[in-house]
Amino acid sequence: MTSFLIASNILLWLAFLGVTVVMLGLMRQVGLLHERSSPMGAMITDHGPDIGDAAPEFELPDFFGRPVRIGGAEAQGRQTLLMFTAPSCPVCDKLFPIIKSIGRAEGINVVMISDGAPEEHRRFLDSHELGEMRYVVSAEAGMAFQVGKIPYGVLLDGQGIIRAKGLTNTREHLESLLEADRTGFASLQQYMASRKKQAA
């Protein structure tokens, strides 16, 4: 009986040591993955005007008939965030209050640009308070910027120059557009790549 207890105790300790080795290996792998994965900003997925180019210029009416100017110098020199969305896009719907709060907090103009049937836009606007934002229905603007996926953001400086752009599915993606402009890099990915080169 005693030899059975000794053998089971030895087996238990061997199993414990095995689990410990496996856990240490897993912790190391998680650490390596964490180190390799950098923050992801808004991904540039279009083939439209490049960062540093002048944005295409438009004079369009918003959904309510008021004139909206896209591109070119802004009268007060403020930045403009163009958000390409759709009333049927669930991610756009979720981002709407975030876009509104970032626009207000950063003091930038926000122009929501969409296309589709007027009834869809009316339903969307009936359930969302625009505040200072403008809402434009224009397939032409989306084609000029060659937007293929939504929600897509384009940040213009006060002179109408594209400073940052990319697919914006989260608050972090939206904030990365502003951060890319502040740091002078075209995208967060470009910024992280330059940091890796400096570290090497």
Curated annotation (Swiss-Prot):
Q: Where is the signal peptide?
A: none
What the entry lists under InterPro entries is as follows: AhpC/TSA, MeN_DH_accessory, Thioredoxin-like_sf, Thioredoxin_domain, Thioredoxin_ResA/DsbE_sf
Recorded protein name is Methylamine utilization protein MauD
Domain Thioredoxin: from-to ranges = 49-183
What domain of life? Bacteria
Annotated Gene3D superfamilies: Glutaredoxin
- Give the subcellular location: Membrane
What lineage does the source organism belong to? Answer: Bacteria, Pseudomonadati, Pseudomonadota, Alphaproteobacteria, Rhodobacterales
